[in-house]
């Protein structure tokens, strides 16, 4: 299926490894130019950039802390200067708040908000004017299953917060031919092999008894970014093996 992404530009945060790197390469295979960033792992990001360039696309790869509004603005400006546009923004950069509420402390709480909520805020504030200018855009945010399963108060708060942000944004930008959607992955393996070897690690009540494959999430991203998803907005797609039914 033709996604219509060839020649478009996808900006992806948290793109140095795991789901972020897989997403970057998935978009590159569709012919999309890339603007990718990481807050720390520049060596890994450089490797992703080289793999993407080998697929024939242009790449801007930068160190960028999404909690820093000025840094995000500079990253988006460089993307526009070098690639001319931003059509798709995928907010993958995240902070995992794993502590129980009474054990994690305020620092973990504020860090979770800064990366998982303020980060997408900065990205969207900077890319939306470019999308509005071209009257086309796709915002894709990443949530999870914690809001639905009660997986830790801090984690559940930020993951549900991004769902609310996505839905509110979807209403505000719809008149500009821009969609905003969310994906809620379950436990995702780093490879198809790991996904099939993980039956003992997944929740006992999960119908599909394995971790998800990265491509089972990136395929949803590609659909939501495609021309064919222009009538889909404000949704949260749960890709979780049935751990939670919505």
Model region roles, listed by residue range:
Residues 32-47:
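Conserved glycine-rich Rossmann-like NAD(P)H-binding loop of the short-chain dehydrogenase/reductase
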Residues 129, 171-175, 230:
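Alpha-helical segment proximal to the catalytic Tyr-Lys
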Residues 174, 179, 232-234, 240:
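Short, small/polar-rich loop/turn modules that mediate ligand/substrate recognition or access, typified
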């Amino acid at each position: 299926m033709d996604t219509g992404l060839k020649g478009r530009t996808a900006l992806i945060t948290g793109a140095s490894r795991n789901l972020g790197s897989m997403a970057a390469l998935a978009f590159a295979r569709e012919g999309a130019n890339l603007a990718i960033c990481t807050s720390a792992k520049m060596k890994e990001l450089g490797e992703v950039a080289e793999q993407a360039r080998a697929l024939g696309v242009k790449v801007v790869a930068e160190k960028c802390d999404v909690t820093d509004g000025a840094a995000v603005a500079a990253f988006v400006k460089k993307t526009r200067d070098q690639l001319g546009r931003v059509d798709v923004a995928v907010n993958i950069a995240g902070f995992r708040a794993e502590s129980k509420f009474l054990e994690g402390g305020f620092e973990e709480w504020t860090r979770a908000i800064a990366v998982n909520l303020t980060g997408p805020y900065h990205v969207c504030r900077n890319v939306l004017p470019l999308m509005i200018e071209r009257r086309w855009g796709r915002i894709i945010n990443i949530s999870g299953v914690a809001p639905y399963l009660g997986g830790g108060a801090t984690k559940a708060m930020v993951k549900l917060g991004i769902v609310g942000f996505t839905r509110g944004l979807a209403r505000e930008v719809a008149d500009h031919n821009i969609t905003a959607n969310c994906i809620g992955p379950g436990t995702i393996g780093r490879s198809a092999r790991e996904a099939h070897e993980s039956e003992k690690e997944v929740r006992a009540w999960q119908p599909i008894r394995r971790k998800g494959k990265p491509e089972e999430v990136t395929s949803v991203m590609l659909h939501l970014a495609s021309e064919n998803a222009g009538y889909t907005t404000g949704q949260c797609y749960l890709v979780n093996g049935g751990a939670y039914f919505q």
